[in-house]
Each structure stands twice: as structure tokens, then as C-alpha cells.
Amino acid sequence: MTTIVSVRRNGHVVIAGDGQATLGNTVMKGNVKKVRRLYNDKVIAGFAGGTADAFTLFELFERKLEMHQGHLIKAAVELAKDWRTDRMLRKLEALLAVADETASLIITGNGDVVQPENDLIAIGSGGPYAQAAARALLENTELSAREIAEKALDIAGDICIYTNHFHTIEELSYKA
């Protein structure tokens, strides 16, 4: 699968992901970019799950952002509604982590839109390892959001066989 981690600290929000794509238990590609900028670079998003499914969801989410003038929560709720109720979309298997200057969210195909505590998100097969690492670093260091995300991905990559050490990182700055 993959690992996507999002950390928010001191006026910065980061979403970072590894680059491994697998087919069954075979690595097919090691440099997939699973994190990207959307809506005029005001939103960052990462995916865990099927690559083709995720690209479809990125496109749909960007349309929802445009429809709601960049309002992240409204766009996320509308995407989750469509994802849950549309027969074709329901078959898509992926999770999205999205963030802007005000919120960090997880969007699922079950219709869930979750804003996690401490604005810390970790999804995918390496998510539990990345979340534990990031939480420890948030609580015990003064590292930046970017440094925490990188270290959390490194730790997940050392433990999870579906996560590698090729990282794509996107960062937004805002007034804290």
C-alpha cells in the first residue's frame, strides 16, 4: 500500500508520502508521487490505495474545491457523499489526506470526513508506524512539521514492506 503522513506545526502544514507502488507482493515502481497540490496550490493532498483510483479522486476533489471556492471542509463532505452514494465511485479503494491553512482531514469511501486530534494524519499500511513516530516527535522535540513528517516516513519505511524511502513532500505556510 503506502504511507502518507501530515503534520501541522508553527504555521506550517506538510503532507508527505513514500513512492512505492506494488502489484500484489511485487514492487512495480519506486517513485510514484502520491502527494500533490490542488486548487491553485492552496490545498495539498495525498493518497493511500489504488493509484488509478486515487487520481480519479484527486480530479473529483479538485472539482469540488472549485465548486465551493476552495472551502476545504465543504468540498471534502461533498466528495465523501458522492463517493459513498455513487455506484461507480463506491468501488474506488483509496484514502485521501487533505489540508489547507485551516484544517487537515481524512476522507474515506465510507462517507467519513475526519479531522483528527492534533492535526496529525497517518494513513496507509505504514500509517500506524508513522503516526506513532510523528506523535512522539511532536510531543518531545521542537522539530519543524517538515522534519517530523520526513522522520516519520523514514521510520515507517524501515518497518513497513509496502513503504519505501522515496519521499514526496508538499508544504503550506500560514499565519499561526
From Swiss-Prot:
Active site: 2
The name this protein goes by in its record: ATP-dependent protease subunit HslV
Localization in the cell: Cytoplasm
GO cellular component: HslUV protease complex; proteasome core complex
EC code: 3.4.25.2
Description of how activity is regulated: Allosterically activated by HslU binding.
Keyword annotations from UniProtKB, A to Z: Allosteric enzyme, Cytoplasm, Hydrolase, Metal-binding, Protease, Sodium, Stress response, Threonine protease
Highest rank taxon of the organism: Bacteria
A Pfam entry, by short name: Proteasome
Subunit structure: A double ring-shaped homohexamer of HslV is capped on each side by a ring-shaped HslU homohexamer. The assembly of the HslU/HslV complex is dependent on binding of ATP.
Primary residence: cytoplasm
Class in the EC hierarchy, top level: hydrolase
Catalytic activity: ATP-dependent cleavage of peptide bonds with broad specificity
Family (UniProt): Belongs to the peptidase T1B family. HslV subfamily.
Binding annotation for Na(+): 157, 160, 163
Keyword Lyase part of the UniProt annotation: no
NCBIfam families: ATP_dep_HslV, PRK05456.1
UniProt-listed GO biological process terms: proteolysis involved in protein catabolic process
